[in-house]
Each structure stands twice: as structure tokens, then as C-alpha cells.
Amino acid sequence: MQFLNQFLSITQIEYLKVIARMILNAECSKGTLFYLLNGHKRLQKKIVQAVDVFLPNSDSEMKRVCDDFNLKDYYYVAVPNAVDINKFDYDNVTVDDSIEFYRDCVLCVSRIEGRKNQLNIIKAIKDLPYKFVFIGQAGANFKKYYEKCKKEAPSNVFFLGQVEHDKLPQFYKLAKVHILASWMETPGLSSLEAAVMKTNIVVTKKGDTEDYFKEYAYYCEPDDLDSIRRAVIAAFEAPFNEELSDRILKHYKWEDTAKATLEGYNRIIGKQ
């Protein structure tokens, strides 16, 4: 994945992923053949040209679309990713004794796959004295990657596999740090969930994370092990800044997402 990100564009990577799924999973249909014949970028352009209102997850995501397709005249409403504040309610979550062993861990909640970059996280944090907990199952076609992560991991790294979503608030509450050092995030739902549960977050600089978390997150470069390590240490040693959870509660509830989506539809109606 690191090699692909360095030498290929996102559209080229997506094209190769479709070919890989066709070969490895026998995923071949008329749609697949149409896609392969026309190409990723050309089909994207057709879709973009037909759009009345864009609903990106952030202003920076919209800027990338504009840059990629040279858009000059367009409507858009930024529709944020969000968190369920009823489920992820810090004051009403009680941590079960059965998971107290993981108290003050560095947590990563995500599928285990190349794009999420767990292998580089594990390489970066070797010899650090903290407990590291990975929650999530291997992504499709990433079983070998998962095994490589486990082989690389020292004894203070724990893989818990898939955990029921209702139990995640407990893990966020007991964790000291949550990390998503992915190759790209917009911004990563687990980072939002961890932040609203008053856990310091380490996030990738790739994507739209800074639109969401501003100066309250600890940023890292996914291809730089020292950058990941420094961010983890800084986040672990720092007290939690309540302004981060306040920001999530103010701007990134599902109600905010619904209102922004409605605004987008209203713009379409207003243009007709």
C-alpha cells in the first residue's frame, strides 16, 4: 500500500483494486467490464457533469473535487460525518470490569487493512511502554496483512477482533489515546467517536482530518514511522482538551448531518 500511494494516483489504485477483486473474488459482471473499458477517471467525469449539488464531507474534500475536475461553476453543501451522541455519551458509559486490563491503552478501532496502515503503527510504536489495542477484523483480501501485523507486534499489542458496536463506548472511555494513521481519512468515524468520549486522538494528515479536528488532534504522516511515534507519545502525555469533545458535540451530531443534507436538497428545489 505504501508503494502504491507513492507511485500511483488514487484513480489508478482504484482501477487496480477492481481488477484484483475480479481476479481474486471472481467479481465480474457487465458493470465491471463497462468500468474497465471506460476507466475510473472518465466515469467519474460523467458523474460529476451530471451533479446539481455536491454533498462532500468537508470543504477540503470539495476543493479536491474542484481541482481534480477543473470545476468552476458548482453548488455544494458540506455534509459532515457524525457521531451518535446518545450512544457515545461519556457521562452515561460505565466501563465493565472485564476490560479494565486495557485501561489507558492506545486504541485503534478500524478494519485491519493496508489503507488503515496498522502495520506502520506497530512498527512505529515498538519499545514504547504502553498497551496497544486493535479492534476490528481483517478487511476483504487482507487476511495476510492481518497475519503480518500480528507477527510484527510485540507482547504489549493486543488484537481483539470484532467487538460489538454497543461495547465500543467503553473501550473509548478507558483508552488514553485513539489512533488512525491511515493513508486517507474524511475524517474517520472512530476518531469522532473517540474524541467525543474524551480520548486524545492521533490522526493522519492525509485527507480532511484538519477540517474536523483543527488544532485539537495530534497529526502524523502515515509513511513516517517517527512521525507516528512522536504523535502517539505527545497524545499519551497530554491531558485531554475538553474543547475537542465540545467541538464534536456542537458540529458533528447526526442532526447536523441531516440539516446539511436537507439544505442540499433545498438548493436543488430552489434551482428548478
Q: Predicted regions span which residues?
A:
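Short alpha-helical donor nucleotide-sugar binding micro-motif in glycosyltransferases
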Residues: 162-163, 170-175
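Aromatic "clamp/platform" in nucleotide-sugar-dependent glycosyltransferases that forms part
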Residues: 183
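Membrane-proximal helix-turn-helix segments that form the acceptor-binding/catalytic region
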Residues: 11-54
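Short, structured helix-loop element that forms part of the nucleotide-activated donor/catalytic region
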Residues: 68, 131-160, 166-167
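Short hydrophobic beta-strand element within catalytic cores of glycosyltransferases
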Residues: 198-203
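Conserved acidic donor-binding segment of nucleotide-sugar-dependent glycosyltransferases
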Residues: 217-225, 233-238
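Acidic anion/phosphate-binding donor-loop and adjacent secondary structure
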Residues: 66, 82-103, 270-272
